[in-house]
Amino acid sequence: MILHFIESPVYSQQIDDLLSPEDHRQLQLYLFQFPDQGDLIKGSGGLRKLRWAGSGRGKRGGIRVIYYLWHGDTAFMLTAYPKNEQTDLTPAQTRALKQLIEKYTTER
């Protein structure tokens, strides 16, 4: 199986601040092996939230990665944030990301 990663500009900037390049590769490898491991976000149209350990952040310094798995072979990496700054997406954030995915996937 091949899994393609498409990163939003926001995600690319956030993940660079949160993970080392090696830790980011480990995250991608994990998603390659287990693409549906993130918890489904209720009412999001299929968005997933993956809990991941942050680089040098210790046991409690995890991050959250929000992504959308499309057709089982494409992962849209949308946003990432430290757990200690935000635990869940707000309803407005969830709606905005859902609309973004709906727009993108219907144009393809």
Placement of each model-derived feature along the sequence:
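Basic/aromatic recognition patch in beta-strand/loop cores that engages polyanionic ligands
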Residues: Q37, I41-Y81, E85
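Arg/Lys-rich, positively charged N-terminal/basic patches that mediate binding to nucleic acids
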Residues: M1-E22
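Residues that form generic nucleotide/phosphate-binding pockets
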Residues: Q14, Y30, L100
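Compact soluble domain cores
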Residues: L19-G38
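Enriched for short, Lys/Arg-rich terminal
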Residues: Y68-R108
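Amphipathic alpha-helical interface surfaces
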Residues: E7, D23, L27, K59-G62, ...
